From Swiss-Prot:
Organism lineage: Eukaryota, Metazoa, Chordata, Craniata, Vertebrata
GO cellular component: extracellular region
GO biological process: defense response to bacterium; killing of cells of another organism
Localization per record: Secreted
Name of the featured protein: Cathelicidin-3.4
Role played: Has potent antibacterial activity against the Gram-negative bacteria E.coli and P.aeruginosa. Less active against the Gram-positive bacteria S.aureus and L.monocytogenes. Has low hemolytic activity towards human red blood cells.
Keyword Magnesium on entry: no
Length: 26
């Protein structure tokens, strides 16, 4: 009986709001 969050993806996996602008810097 494993309770893995497969149906609901962890919000942590999503990039933060400051992630998109950071890419521009790269």
């Amino acid at each position: 009986r494993f309770r893995l969050p497969f149906r609901r993806p962890p919000i942590r996996i999503h990039p933060p709001p400051f992630y998109p602008p950071f890419r521009r810097f790269l």
